[in-house]
């Protein structure tokens, strides 16, 4: 077979043969096989050219994808699938990129976790979930997590939450709110409790009284339309307890309020 045309088409070249066959190849393929118009090639050589062209095209696509930011192996595989590249060729591209250090799931996970240590607010459970979604193995994630202490991150998040809710909630509700937020962010209950216990979060009696009377004003308006006497008192006690107020504080406030 003889090459009758080599024509540049954007990123690729169109190669035509005298038997009517056509295929798109990369510039790297032309250089590697020293292709030119009128060059004679065999069936075996054509297969090699086509395979390498697919590999070269896939690698170029992957490198373009990686040029914006680091990616995991799973992310690169999914990107290449969009271009209908043969699965075997994709595996060859991935192996080549891993060998050249373009893809390293361990380094990717370490970078994400380390960045979280410096300025993030996620605990190990949420980080594990996010990294697993990107295709990183559980064993790799666990191995890297073992190198990090999340107590400082938990304390940093707890301090921010304290600033947000202090003076707005009674003591028990404040504790519940901060611990719940920490567990939602991926910290274990024990780590969240330790972080809360290390806070200077004393809610004084004056603040508690101010909060409970403010809440009473709102709830009394709501329940006094339907209830009175003992039942009204019970309804108000229940709703205030659900909001985190101690029963002794509730009883004291109701004696003054009603």
From Swiss-Prot:
InterPro entries: RecX_HTH_1st, RecX_HTH_2nd, RecX_HTH_3rd, Regulatory_RecX, WH-like_DNA-bd_sf. The keyword ATP-binding does not apply. GO terms for biological process: regulation of DNA repair. It is found in: Cytoplasm. Disulfide bonds: none annotated. It comes from the Bacteria. Pfam families: RecX_HTH1 (PF21982), RecX_HTH2 (PF02631), RecX_HTH3 (PF21981). PANTHER family: REGULATORY PROTEIN RECX FAMILY PROTEIN (PTHR33602:SF1). This is Regulatory protein RecX. The gene is recX.
């Amino acid at each position: 077979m003889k090459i009758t045309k080599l024509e540049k088409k954007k990123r690729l070249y169109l190669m035509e043969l005298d038997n009517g066959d056509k295929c798109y190849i990369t510039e790297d393929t032309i250089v590697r096989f020293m292709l030119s118009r009128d060059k004679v090639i065999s069936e075996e050589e054509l297969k090699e050219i086509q395979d390498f062209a697919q590999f070269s095209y896939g690698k170029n696509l992957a490198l373009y994808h990686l040029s914006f930011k680091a990616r995991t192996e799973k992310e690169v595989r999914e990107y290449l699938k969009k271009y209908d590249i043969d699965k075997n060729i994709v595996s060859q591209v991935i192996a080549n990129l891993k060998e050249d250090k373009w893809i390293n799931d361990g380094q990717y996970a370490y970078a994400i976790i380390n960045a979280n240590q410096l300025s993030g607010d996620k605990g190990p459970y949420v980080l594990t979930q996010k990294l697993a979604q990107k295709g990183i193995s559980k064993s790799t994630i666990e191995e890297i997590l073992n190198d990090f202490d999340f107590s400082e991150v938990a304390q940093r998040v707890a301090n921010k939450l304290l600033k947000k809710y202090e003076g707005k909630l009674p003591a028990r509700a404040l504790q519940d709110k901060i611990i719940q937020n920490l567990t939602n962010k991926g910290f274990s209950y024990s780590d969240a409790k330790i972080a809360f216990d290390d806070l200077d979060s004393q809610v004084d009696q004056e603040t508690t009284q101010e909060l409970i009377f403010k809440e009473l004003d709102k709830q009394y308006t709501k329940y006094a339309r339907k209830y009175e006497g003992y039942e009204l008192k019970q309804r108000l006690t229940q709703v205030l307890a659900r909001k985190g107020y101690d029963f002794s504080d509730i009883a004291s406030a109701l004696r003054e309020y009603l």
